[in-house]
Amino acid sequence: MATMARSFLQAISKDEAVAPPLRVVQIEGLAVLKIIKHCKEFSPTLVTGQLLGLDVGSVLEVTNCFPFPVRDDDEEIEADGANYQLEMMRCLREVNVDNNTVGWYQSTVLGSYQTVELIETFMNYQENIKRCVCIIYDPSKADLGVLALKALKLSDSFMELYRGGNFTGEKLREKNFSWMDIFEEIPIKVSNSALVSAFMTELETDTPVSQGDYDRLHSSTTPFLENNMEFLIKCMDDLSMEQQKFQYYYRNLSRQQAQQQAWLQKRRTENMARKSAGEEPLPEEDPSNPIFKAIPEPSRLESFLITNQVSNFCGQINGVAGQNFSRLYLTKALHDN
């Protein structure tokens, strides 16, 4: 019996050590509606909420969620946030709702979610939850007939770098790490129970074409394109400022290296004279000399995040432009006929 128990425990520990990678986030339709309702009601204010569910193998099931209250005072948020979450967990437990935290959701404006604050929140969740996700919802895309819902997690390689706090160019080249390796997008699968699916089938009308289908044919997306261009220009300015920081760093580094070479040449000449006089040579390095003090290299994390945002805005502009061209060609063909 003891041998069987020991084998069982070894099998459990082995399964826990070799956890399958996360392949899909399965979210209930009710949770999706709650997220959309919360983000839409407070738009353009950014809001967040807690995700509840189960971690089953390679699938992360999100069965429910609840919103976090919106407060202006950061100190008030810190004081009341923990108590609010505990009270909500207790209430959900009493009504037999899954109360296991699997991550959080948050709204965004035009997909500009790649920030240091998001990474810090991820790392805080990672202390207690090994596999947590963040579901991002963009209410601004709802007017275009798009359900802008995506699930994100931090890559393992990025978390290793972040814990080490080393985002220098040498370290990034050693790890072969680029700005595209920060986030991993997990596919989302929306699921409903059989009763809900049957009920939705009953509610579905027999009309083959709805007003939403006509709305998707509208080519007027001027505000969306303008906002994307405005955000893109701002990101390019921020990226230019980051590049100026690195240019300033490399100028100082080159100046320091030139000063070090001049100092070493002078010291070697002095040592040759001392040897000729029969005196002990002086050390060629002087740690007390300011020119030998290492200049700290700026972190590349901020520039990587800004590059992520630039790529996101370019992708959105490209997508909307492509859709509008398709609509224009369709309209032209109908007009010609």
Swiss-Prot record:
One of its GO terms (molecular function) is metallopeptidase activity. Disruption phenotype: Pleiotropic growth defects throughout development including postembryonic growth retardation, and delayed shoot and root growth, flowering, and senescence. Lethal at 80 percent at the vegetative rosettes stage. Reduced fertility. Compromised translation efficiency of specific 5' mRNA leader sequences. Requires exogenous sugar to transit from seedling to vegetative development, but hypersensitive to elevated levels of exogenous sugars (e.g. sucrose, maltose and glucose). Enhanced sensitivity to abscisic acid (ABA). Impaired uORF-RNAs polysomal association. The modification Phosphoserine is found at residue 178. Component of the eukaryotic translation initiation factor 3 (eIF-3) complex. Interacts directly with TIF3A1, TIF3B1, TIF3C1, TIF3E1 and TIF3F1. Associates with the CSN (COP9 signalosome) complex. Binds to CSN1, CSN7 and CSN8. Interacts with ATPK1. The lineage of its organism: Eukaryota, Viridiplantae, Streptophyta, Embryophyta, Tracheophyta. Residues 267-290 are annotated as: Disordered. It is found in: Cytoplasm. Residues 25-158 form the MPN domain. This is Eukaryotic translation initiation factor 3 subunit H.
